[in-house]
Amino acid sequence: APVSKHAAFAYTTALNYLLEDNAHVKAIGDTTVVYWAESADPQYQDAFGCFIEGNVVTYYDLNAVMGALSRGKTVDWDGLPLKPDNRFYVLGLAPNAARISVRFFLRDTFGDYADHIGKHYERIRIVKPDYDKDENISLWKLLSETTNPKVSDKSASPQMAGDTMKAIFSGTRYPATLFQQTMMRIRAEKRVSRGRSAIIKAYLLKNSTNIDLKEDGTVALNESTNSVPYVLGRLFSILENIQDSASGASTVKDRYFNSACSTPATVFPLLLKLKNSHMKVMMRDKPGLAVSFDKQVTELIGRLPE
């Protein structure tokens, strides 16, 4: 649609002013995220920036701030008030040939943003290994889990990244491409990281209508569930540990991970037969560990239907 000279001057001047404020602009993938409060108070931008980064404050501090805002309470932020009913705007810009395109433009109260982002962090919360020092998984880190670490350009898919940001900020369903690209990297690398586990957990909790899947999506290992996919995943992990402890050679994960995911009824009987030969070695060299593994395998098999 035609735009008057005055309108063009007004919106370009305003946009340039916002983009010059580097402290309140985030580049995520190819998307530049600009955000501001209707009241023009900078503490809202400061807080929102921390919400996006995630790992700059502890989970509990972040959860306390966003939880209070989502319940309609005013929060103190470095001596300045954050009011939940203050209008807040988030603009996602992406390059498009010689122009700039709008990937998303969101308008909501600051309390609603806090609620949406806080629930996202709760969904991706998962037990982390000791070497991982990040309390939370930032948005940038989450998107990087969908990329190939061996290529020079490690940027996430632009459309997927934009759709994921929009879903998190607005509290809507995650894009299917986030789940699909995560699973593709897992199958290609045969490696499940904390971030990838968190993506799968969050996607199933938010998008799935399967009650069993929602119940299995816990922060730590759910030892009480009888969900067949969950139990098989635990069983596969133990079978891998058995082979690694017995021989130290390439594990079942290297050879059977993809087929175990696609045809478990065919692969698991074979893996259990292989387990028996490895257990003989362990009973000779590491009898205590062998007994422990055997009890775990027996307990998990007992959870599977006949």
Residue ranges of each PLM-predicted region?
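Extended alpha-helical scaffolding segments
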Residues: 1-306
